[in-house]
UniProtKB/Swiss-Prot annotation:
One of its GO terms (biological process) is virion assembly. A zinc finger (CCHC-type) spans 590-607. A motif (PTAP/PSAP motif) lies at residues 199-202. GO terms for cellular component: extracellular region; host cell plasma membrane; membrane. It comes from Moloney murine leukemia virus (strain neuropathogenic variant ts1-92b). Glycans are attached at N60, N113, N505. Seems to be important for efficient replication in vivo. This is Glyco-Gag protein. Keywords: Coiled coil, Glycoprotein, Host cell membrane, Host membrane, Membrane, Metal-binding, Phosphoprotein, Secreted, Transmembrane, Transmembrane helix, Zinc, Zinc-finger. Residues 523-554, 574-607 have a biased composition (Basic and acidic residues). The lineage of its organism: Viruses, Riboviria, Pararnavirae, Artverviricota, Revtraviricetes. Residues 195-310, 523-626 are annotated as: Disordered. The modification Phosphoserine is found at S280. Residues 195-211 have a biased composition (Pro residues). The chain crosses the membrane at residues 64-86.
Length: 626
């Protein structure tokens, strides 16, 4: 304790030691009951040291004190962090978007099953920034509502410049998550609502409950139950908008045949009897809206045969607007028989037309020659009792008559005849739409630059149906269709499909999925232009470099040749000088240097010409330019 302030010169007196030397007090001090230390300070010290200085000295000297203090501080810090995280975690909100990001591996697996690839960054961008701008109610945090997903999908798949092909893999994956949710997404998927029950005509508060309806509502009616009829309700003025909504599309026709009375009396007798309250002003206004002239109503969506409010089949003919729209919005039978056949098939299934309606439909959508060809093919499809096509006139006329039959749609036998007639008519449309066999037409169907493999396959199958007698859906024709799909696909897709491993064991569905994957990984037009520009620049740079190298090589070759030429000239001159020196050194003492004869010297040579010396010719030197 010599370092403790104020203890200089102190006398330390220790009590007797404890009998148990292994026991220690706090911070290593002996226990209280075993003795204590008396500190006697300096007599001259007037003021005792403060306790803080004593504690600091203990902190500096005792390792146990430091360990205990650090442990207490660490525990407090951990407790604070735990409480903070608990409060924040309790306030976290899970959204469909965050849920998909937390299970991104499963999302990628589902996308791979759909033969598409998705990226997390674009997933977030489309969900939070792109799809909310479609004005279909898509929230920024995403949703698993099937209706909203379907509306966004329609926007994405829109043809022309309004579509978004780059968003197709992402909305397809969203749709797969909603319609086939994994376990972690099932609690967030909206349950599929049951199909809404169409309101029945007698349930409207405008007619007395016991009266027989004189006209049917536009909306499908329910068969009346066997129980007691509900009491009619009188709507208040606040419910006026509901009544307006129900009467937006009034029925265009009155019932030409009043339904049989069920014993409750007609509506004219029921109203004065006082069984129903007087109609309200809103109901009067509604009745006024529902009773315009029949000829002005041309926007009907009603079926020719449908169940009325009393459970009886009622007849509603086609409206002129429906026939007009079907004719103008579809190609002719000669141009595209498949599309028009599909339209007529849907009409036959949903509208359940009578014999007269079928003739009206064929007369509107087909030309005279096309109609005769369809009727002829339909009569050829009539089968006899043995199940094989028959040519017996009585059986053919009974199944597919050319004159108006007396089939009553209110009876079971009449409805059976109508069903058979519609089936034969559909078979006649399919057979009449086939052109003569022309395989060249099938081979001429090729995939467009921006056409998806699925759309191309549909066009190819339609060509098979139209120009060949084969059915592309037949398993025996799958190999031929698959080979045509590979050979007539786009060049980049066809090359990759031909290099697939185990190609002979691939089904047509496998080839389509692989083609879709290749199609989705194609570069965009902007990327293609950038690649072409970059390749052009690289080619120009490479050509310029090659030209510079060739020019440098040509200069080096020219300098090398000139150097060789100069070296040859210089060496020849040197040899000439050396040769002249050697010849001059070989002359004898009395030999002439001019005529090489002995007996005189060159200055006395008689053969040497005399007279003045002419000018010496100028010596020409060879330069690099020569």
């Amino acid at each position: 304790l010599g370092d403790v302030p104020g203890t200089s010169g102190a006398v330390f007196v220790a009590r007797p030691e404890s009998k148990n030397p292994d026991r220690f007090g706090l911070f290593g001090a002996p226990p209280l009951e075993e003795g204590y230390v008396v500190l006697v300070g300096d007599e001259n010290l007037k003021q005792f040291p403060p306790p803080s200085e004593f504690l600091l000295s203990v902190w500096n000297r005792s390792r146990a004190a430091r360990l205990v203090c650090c442990s207490i501080v660490l525990c407090c810090l951990c407790l604070t962090v735990f409480l903070y995280l608990s409060e924040n975690m309790g306030q976290t909100v899970t959204t469909p978007l965050s849920l998909t990001l937390d299970h991104w591996k499963d999302v990628e697996r589902i996308a791979h099953n759909q033969s598409v690839d998705v990226k997390k960054r674009r997933w977030v961008t489309f969900c939070s920034a792109e799809w909310p701008t479609f004005n279909v109610g898509w929230p920024r945090d995403g949703t698993f509502n099937r209706d909203l997903i379907t509306q966004v999908k329609i926007k994405v798949f829109s043809p022309g410049p309004h579509g978004h092909p780059d968003q197709v893999p992402y909305i397809v994956t969203w749709e797969a998550l909603a319609f086939d949710p994994p376990p972690w997404a099932k609690p967030f998927v909206h349950p599929k609502p049951p199909p809404p029950l169409p309101p029945s005509a007698p349930s409207l508060p405008l007619e007395p409950p016991l009266s027989t309806p004189s006209r049917s509502s536009l909306y499908p009616a329910l068969t009346p139950s066997l129980g007691a009829k509900p009491k009619p309700q009188v709507l208040s003025d606040s419910e006026g908008p509901l009544i307006d909504l129900l009467t937006e599309d009034p029925p265009p026709y009155r019932d030409p045949r009043p339904p049989p009375s069920d014993g409750d009396g007609n509506s004219g007798e029921a109203t004065p009897a006082g069984e129903a309250p007087d109609p309200s002003p809103m109901a009067s206004r509604l009745r006024g809206r529902r009773e315009p002239p029949v000829a002005d109503s041309t926007t009907s969506q009603a079926f020719p045969l449908r169940t009325g409010g009393n459970g009886q089949l009622q007849y509603w003919p086609f409206s002129s607007s429906d026939l007009y729209n079907w004719k103008n919005n579809n190609p002719s039978f000669s141009e595209d028989p498949g599309k028009l056949t599909a339209l007529i098939e849907s009409v036959l299934i949903t509208h359940q037309p009578t014999w007269d309606d079928c003739q009206q439909l064929l007369g509107t959508l087909l030309t005279g020659e096309e109609k005769q060809r369809v009727l002829l093919e339909a009569r050829k499809a009539v089968r006899g009792d043995d199940g094989r096509p028959t040519q017996l006139p009585n059986e053919v006329d009974a199944a597919f008559p050319l004159e108006r039959p007396d089939w009553e749609y209110t009876t079971q036998a009449g409805r059976n005849h109508l069903v058979q007639y519609r089936q034969l008519l559909l078979a006649g449309l399919q057979n009449a739409g086939r052109s003569p066999t022309n395989l060249a037409k099938v081979k001429g169907i090729t995939q467009g630059p921006n056409e998806s493999p699925s759309a191309f396959l549909e066009r190819l199958k339609e060509a098979y149906r139209r120009y060949t007698p084969y059915d592309p859906e037949d398993p025996g024709q799958e190999t031929n269709v698959a080979m045509s799909f590979i050979w007539q696909s786009a060049p980049d897709i066809g090359r990759k499909l031909e290099r697939l491993e185990d190609l002979k064991n691939k089904t047509l569905g496998d080839l389509v999925r692989e083609a879709e994957r290749i199609f989705n990984k194609r570069e965009t037009p902007e990327e293609r232009e950038e690649r072409i520009r970059r390749e052009t620049e690289e080619k120009e740079e490479r050509r310029r470099t090659e030209d510079e190298q060739k020019e440098k090589e040509r200069d080096r070759r020219r300098h090398r040749e000139m150097s060789k030429l100069l070296a040859t000239v210089v060496s020849g001159q040197r040899q000439d000088r050396q040769g002249g020196e050697r010849r001059r050194s070989q002359l004898d003492r009395d030999q002439c240097a001019y005529c090489k004869e002995k007996g005189h010297w060159a200055k006395d040579c008689p053969k040497k010409p005399r007279g003045p010396r002419g000018p010496r010719p100028q010596t020409s030197l060879l330069t690099l330019d020569d």
